[in-house]
């Protein structure tokens, strides 16, 4: 190796070492990591100890078969583990139910957290009777870590709360207070839940009362662990997995997310405002009044054979005033990923305090999302407000979009007509210049276009305007919850695929079913391609283009087979309107008049003096032709 190679290796090594040095964690970060690891290990050890003691007490009570207090030695052990919280080790199992017009939640006595949530306005796929259940039993767990004044670390999920108060006011707002008692007089911890009369948002306040008597004096924050397993709610598991992901927003408004395709993990030292456990159409969002600190989040997919699709985990820290002078306030959003519903939570809210929950609805890239927000969603909401069937709504949206694009489509069809009129002359050029003289053929073709005043690229202009709208609908329809459960013809749910044939062995890139709307859309696309290609010029190079154009619809059949039937229905209707527009234009345009107009323009241009740029361009073309002829002669002499 030469000197430069050794220098290169040395520089690379220096960069690697320098990068490692600059990115190593600080002493404070290392200390925080060690504290978290130590506390987790200590919690696990003490949980095991408490569990063993609790099992001993239960076994003794069963042996004695009397409702007496445990023996003195076990009671002492229990007090040693739980300290003033020993009374909370025994209690009532079950849930307390709260409900309003939209949700029904169950708050568990053990742990004092929301253990069940149902959405009254929605049904699970294949169940037309029972409300959709977001989670139940052990699918959702919320746990807080407490440090006692004897430096014991306890977790709320192992302790029993009591229902201290439950009341509903005249407006239908319900309040429930779950209390964690101690053996110290007037010393307890309250979880206060507030359920408005007609909302998906549930308030949760953590209110200590004289807890400085039971907890460590230096305890100013508590760790929180929130885990949830997301059950499959939809027919199409593949799409549900694609849209299910963990998202979170920093204080300040920036939104980030974990991977929806594979297991992922994030360690965030920055303050976080909310964390969302998201499914395709529904979300559970935890919102902090202040912020979540030092947060670790994980997301992992389940095996395809499981009834669950994703598992989410969060470990974070919340500020806590143990004197109770200030409550720690949280909010739960338990509801649909409906754009307007989520956006309404930012109404009349100053910019810095906006939650931006509507970003949970994926609307595509910036320009595509912008089109969805200012055009597609308002138009969709308008037609839906008329009480129309969802199929008619999509039909009207297609018609409006086609009317908006009509001027551009007209210009494209006019350009196509000119190309069609020039087809005989283009065929003559192709016959005159064989494929071996491709450069001369292209020059003659461009000269014809220039003379006739035709631009072969002008037909692409409408596609430039149509493409963002097509992409906007591509993003909007599969995530529009209004399509969920809505039927049209043979499709029983427009939010998922409409299989008419199924089989057991998966076909690569296709799956185990055939969607009828997708098949119809493909057939109509082939018909449109055939009509379009009939108007194109011939030539050897166009034969390959034709095959490619016919291949595209077949590729769409594979691509859209798993997509929402509502999206395939939209593309089918859109293509049908396009074919009708093309045929009407073809029937109303006189090719002879177009040819006469082009000849008149050509004569007019021929009488006009060429611009300096046009003259220079023509001179360059002549020079290229001369050089090409000289090169050909030189090769023949050899």
Give the predicted meaning of each segment.
Residues 4, 67-68, 155:
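Intrinsically disordered/low-complexity terminal segments and short unstructured peptides
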């Amino acid at each position: 190796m030469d000197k430069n190679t050794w220098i290169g290796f040395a520089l690379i090594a220096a960069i690697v070492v320098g990068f490692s040095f600059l990115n190593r964690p600080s002493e404070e970060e290392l200390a925080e990591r060690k504290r978290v690891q130590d506390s987790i290990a200590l919690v696990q050890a003490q949980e095991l100890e408490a569990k063993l003691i609790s099992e001993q007490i239960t076994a003794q009570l069963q042996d004695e078969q009397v409702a007496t207090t445990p023996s003195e030695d076990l009671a002492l052990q229990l007090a040693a583990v739980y300290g003033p919280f020993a009374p909370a080790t025994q209690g009532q199992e079950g849930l307390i139910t709260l409900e309003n017009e939209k949700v029904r939640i169950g708050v568990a006595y053990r742990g004092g957290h929301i253990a069940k949530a149902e959405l009254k306005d929605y049904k699970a796929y294949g169940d037309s009777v029972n409300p959709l259940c977001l989670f139940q039993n052990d699918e959702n767990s919320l746990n807080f870590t407490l440090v006692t004044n004897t430096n014991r670390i306890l977790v709320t999920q192992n302790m029993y709360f009591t229902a201290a108060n439950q009341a509903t006011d005249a407006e239908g707002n319900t309040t429930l207070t779950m209390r964690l008692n101690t053996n110290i007089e007037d010393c307890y911890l309250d979880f206060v839940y507030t359920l408005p009369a007609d909302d998906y948002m549930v308030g949760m306040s953590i209110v200590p009362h004289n807890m400085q008597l039971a907890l460590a004096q230096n305890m100013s924050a508590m760790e929180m662990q929130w885990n949830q397993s997301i059950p499959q709610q939809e027919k199409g598991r593949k799409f549900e997995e694609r849209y299910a992901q963990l998202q979170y927003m920093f204080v300040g408004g920036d939104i980030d997310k974990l991977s929806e395709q594979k297991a992922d993990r994030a360690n965030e030292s920055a303050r976080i405002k909310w964390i969302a456990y998201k499914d395709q159409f529904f979300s559970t969002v935890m919102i902090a009044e202040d912020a979540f600190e030092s947060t670790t989040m994980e997301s992992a997919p389940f095996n395809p054979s499981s009834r669950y699709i994703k598992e989410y985990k969060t470990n974070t820290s919340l500020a806590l005033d143990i004197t109770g002078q200030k409550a720690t306030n949280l909010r739960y959003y338990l509801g649909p990923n409906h754009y307007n519903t989520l956006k309404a939570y930012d109404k009349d809210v100053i910019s810095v305090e906006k939650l931006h929950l509507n970003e949970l609805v994926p609307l595509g890239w910036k320009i595509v999302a912008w089109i969805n927000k200012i055009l597609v969603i308002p138009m969709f909401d308008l037609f839906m407000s008329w009480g129309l069937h969802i199929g008619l709504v999509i039909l009207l949206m297609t018609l409006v979009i086609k009317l908006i694009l009509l001027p551009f489509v007209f210009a494209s069809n006019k350009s196509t007509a000119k190309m069609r009129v020039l087809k005989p002359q283009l065929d003559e050029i192709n016959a005159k210049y064989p494929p071996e003289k491709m450069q001369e053929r292209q020059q003659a073709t461009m000269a014809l276009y220039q003379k006739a005043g035709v631009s072969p690229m002008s037909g692409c202009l409408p596609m430039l305007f149509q493409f963002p709208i097509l992409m906007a609908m591509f993003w909007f329809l599969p995530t529009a919850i209004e399509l969920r459960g809505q039927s049209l013809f043979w499709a029983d749910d427009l939010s998922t695929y409409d299989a008419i044939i199924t089989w057991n062995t998966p076909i690569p890139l296709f799956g185990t079913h055939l969607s009828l709307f997708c098949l119809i859309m493909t057939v109509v696309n082939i018909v449109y391609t055939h009509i379009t290609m009939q108007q194109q010029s011939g030539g050897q190079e166009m034969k390959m283009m034709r095959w490619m154009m016919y291949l595209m619809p077949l590729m769409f059949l594979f691509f859209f087979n798993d997509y929402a039937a509502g999206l395939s229905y939209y593309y089918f209707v859109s293509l049908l309107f396009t074919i009708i527009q093309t045929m009407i234009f073809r029937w109303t345009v006189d090719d002879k008049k177009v040819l006469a107009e082009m000849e008149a323009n050509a004569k007019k241009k021929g009488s006009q003096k060429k611009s300096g740029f046009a003259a220079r361009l023509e001179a360059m073309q002549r020079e290229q032709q001369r050089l090409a002829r000289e090169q050909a002669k030189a090769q023949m002499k050899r």
